[in-house]
């Protein structure tokens, strides 16, 4: 009888510890990003992104963009580039994604690709100085 009781108590402890584990939530990531904890926000966005179904294209695009912004702000260019690519693949509606993608590609020395992204961005905002200077910088490199 004691063995069954011990197993039962052990089972309850394991189950309760599993329920107490905090799962990654989009709202948690947004809050971390809002207060400037970009590294933690990027990690949470990554977990949420992998748990989100590929069928939810709008949500995955949004999460990818936010994750890219966090990685850009902590100067993690490789992860930011990858996340911007995912945001573009999932048709993120804000054209700023092309400007940021151009900046990340320029930073890694991929100048022809950067110019293409700057050009796509400039279709919506032809007088943007960041894009103009980015293109000139790529051409001079």
Model feature map: region roles:
Residues 23, 58-62, 96, 130:
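Start-of-helix register in tetratricopeptide repeats
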Residues 34, 73, 107-108, 137-141:
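Register position in tetratricopeptide repeats
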Residues 62-66, 100, 134-137:
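Canonical tetratricopeptide repeat
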